[in-house]
């Protein structure tokens, strides 16, 4: 018998996370590793599991995440976005609280490109008057 799965895709910075929710005990697996082994900072892990707290579904689903691109912060944000979208497929009534908390909004902030004539995106070489 096929197991019930709920899917969602999340994005943040240059990261894309494909999230699957499976009814279970609340175990989170990112790229085949436990989330505590994969992400180095505790605040990223708590940030990542916020949608479950908002919808009061903590410990109801196992999370399987396939994420690539970006760094740890972007990957955690993409996973959070994906979990929120997947929870919408579980129950459409979650839309109100998730939207109010800003979980469904794709964060548009991206790395600004480097401009020629400058050292970085906005950093210029020191100005000399004489």
UniProtKB/Swiss-Prot annotation:
Signal peptide (UniProt feature, chain positions): none
One MF annotation (Gene Ontology) recorded for this entry: structural constituent of ribosome
Start-end of Basic residues biased regions: 111-130
Record-linked Pfam families: Ribosomal_S9
Region (Disordered): 98-130
Gene3D superfamilies: 3.30.230.10
Keywords tagged on the record: Ribonucleoprotein, Ribosomal protein
Annotated Gene Ontology cellular component terms: cytosolic small ribosomal subunit
Family, per entry: Belongs to the universal ribosomal protein uS9 family.
NCBIfam families in alphabetical order: PRK00132.1
Stated name of the protein: Small ribosomal subunit protein uS9
Species of provenance: Lacticaseibacillus paracasei (strain ATCC 334 / BCRC 17002 / CCUG 31169 / CIP 107868 / KCTC 3260 / NRRL B-441) (Lactobacillus paracasei)
Gene, per the UniProt record: rpsI
């Amino acid at each position: 018998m096929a197991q019930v799965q709920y899917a969602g895709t999340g994005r943040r910075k240059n990261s894309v996370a494909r999230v699957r929710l499976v009814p279970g005990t609340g175990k989170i697996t990112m790229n085949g590793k436990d989330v505590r082994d994969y992400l180095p900072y505790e605040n990223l892990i708590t940030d990542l599991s916020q949608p479950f707290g908002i919808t009061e579904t903590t410990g109801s689903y196992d999370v399987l995440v396939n994420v690539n691109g970006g760094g740890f912060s972007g990957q955690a944000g993409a996973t959070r976005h994906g979990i929120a979208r997947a929870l919408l497929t579980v129950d459409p009534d979650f839309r109100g609280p998730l939207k109010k908390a800003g979980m469904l909004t794709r964060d548009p902030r991206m790395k600004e490109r480097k401009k020629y004539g400058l050292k970085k995106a906005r950093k210029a070489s020191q100005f000399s008057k004489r």
